[in-house]
Design a protein with these regions (language model features):
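Cysteine-centered motifs
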Residues: 4-6
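Anionic-ligand binding patches
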Residues: 12-20, 26-212
Length: 212
């Protein structure tokens, strides 16, 4: 399998008109589909193809994004775009990180209000000083059925705040306040969020590398 490395310029352009989004996360699907809309690409999800979620066995965003993208590309015979992302909190030594979604897992599905409460409780127990700096990190992997891929990383700096605010985002968005802003990602208009999010940062690099 020919996997690219992030320290070299992308060399393969995307020249198709169909793309699989290798995710079952409805929030991510909406956000990525909106970012891809200007390119006239027909987008389908992993669920549209009846794909199960592959086991994410890596301990990095890049590793897990590659697992998802290559699984979808090989299963469908179409190029596939995956995202692996999470929030890292400085005072928690970078947790939850790649385990961001795992922190929300319950027997009845993911409970992000519970996960956000857990993060804040841990910070309170440590008497972490304010502002409680954090960052959202995103890695996008565009994979082709022949095993080639391109990797793009994005980041949004900010802090976590309490109480969580807003219902426009998903995941940890309601407790993440981007640097220099007064609204959390959960309060922010989606178009405004798309201008500054970690995923948008990675997406701009993807567009420059593979679509421009």
């Amino acid at each position: 399998m020919s996997w690219c490395r992030c320290n070299r310029p992308p060399v393969r352009r995307f020249d198709g008109d169909r793309l699989v989004i290798a995710s079952h996360n409805a929030g991510k699907l909406r956000e990525i589909a909106a970012l891809l809309a200007p390119f006239g690409i027909t987008v389908s999800s992993a669920a549209d193809h009846g794909l199960k979620e592959p086991e994410e066995t890596e301990d990095t965003f890049v590793g897990n994004a590659r697992i998802k993208a290559h699984f979808a590309a090989q299963a469908t015979g179409l190029p596939a775009l995956s995202d692996d992302s999470g929030i890292t909190v400085d005072a928690l030594d970078g947790q939850p990180g790649v385990y961001t979604a795992d922190w929300a897992e319950t027997p009845n599905g993911r409970d992000f209000p519970m996960a956000m409460t857990k993060v804040w409780t841990m910070l309170e127990e440590k008497s972490a000083p304010l502002p409680r700096k954090a960052a959202f990190n995103a890695t996008l992997v565009l994979a082709w059925p022949d095993g080639h891929d391109e990797v793009f990383k994005g980041r949004a700096e900010g802090e976590v705040v309490w109480p969580a605010r807003g219902d426009k985002g998903f995941g940890f968005d309601p407790m993440f306040l981007p640097a220099g802003e007064t609204e959390t990602f959960g309060e922010m208009d989606p178009n405004r969020k798309h201008e500054m999010s970690h995923r948008a940062d990675a997406f701009r690099k993807l567009v420059t590398g593979c679509f421009a």
